From Swiss-Prot:
Its EC number is 3.1.-.-. The keyword Metal-binding applies. It is found in: Cytoplasm. Single strand-specific metallo-endoribonuclease involved in late-stage 70S ribosome quality control and in maturation of the 3' terminus of the 16S rRNA. One of its GO terms (molecular function) is metalloendopeptidase activity. It comes from Shewanella frigidimarina (strain NCIMB 400). InterPro entries: MetalPrtase_cat_dom_sf_prd, YbeY, YbeY_CS. Binds 1 zinc ion. This is Endoribonuclease YbeY. The keyword Cytoplasm applies.
Length: 156
């Protein structure tokens, strides 16, 4: 199955006034890259938010009272229930923009990285333990470079 063979239902919610957001098609391309061959049918929501909403969600769900670039909320169904729902990503547009500036990266490349990073979290990847972090970063780098962008972890 190719990436294009994946049935993707992406609910893109824009809750911030920002004319420099990626297109629906770009978000779909990045999700498809991250999902790869793992699932033939996928449903997920990506919500683009402002600083206040990101900070509130980060405080509520992670105990960190500050905004963050991406939050991942995997859908957890009982083992006997098979649903294509992968989960939700919440991405803070102002944080992504600021990070791109600080890291001297093209904004579109950083958006791609954040969508891939969040999607991998929805698939169960994590970066709390060094070994898992290395695996996740390696996969992120491979996927981002496969889309024609530079290694997101390379020092600018």
């Amino acid at each position: 199955m190719s990436q294009q063979g994946i049935s993707l239902d992406l609910d893109l919610q824009i809750a911030v006034d920002n004319p420099r957001l990626p297109t629906q098609a770009e978000f779909e391309t990045w999700v498809r890259a991250a999902i790869g061959q793992t699932k033939p049918v996928v449903e997920l929501t990506i919500r683009i938010v402002d600083i206040a909403e990101s900070q509130q969600l980060n405080s509520t769900y992670r105990g960190k009272d500050k905004p963050t670039n991406v939050l991942s909320f995997p859908f957890e169904a009982p083992p006997e229930v098979e649903l294509p729902l992968l989960g939700d990503l919440v991405i803070c547009a102002p944080v992504v923009e600021q990070e791109a500036i600080e890291q001297n990266k093209p904004l579109i490349a950083h958006w791609a990285h954040m969508v891939i990073h969040g999607s991998l979290h929805l698939l169960g990847y994590d970066h709390i333990i060094d070994e898992e972090a290395d695996e996740m970063e390696s996969l992120e780098t491979q996927l981002v470079e496969g889309l024609g962008f530079d290694n997101p972890y390379k020092e600018a």
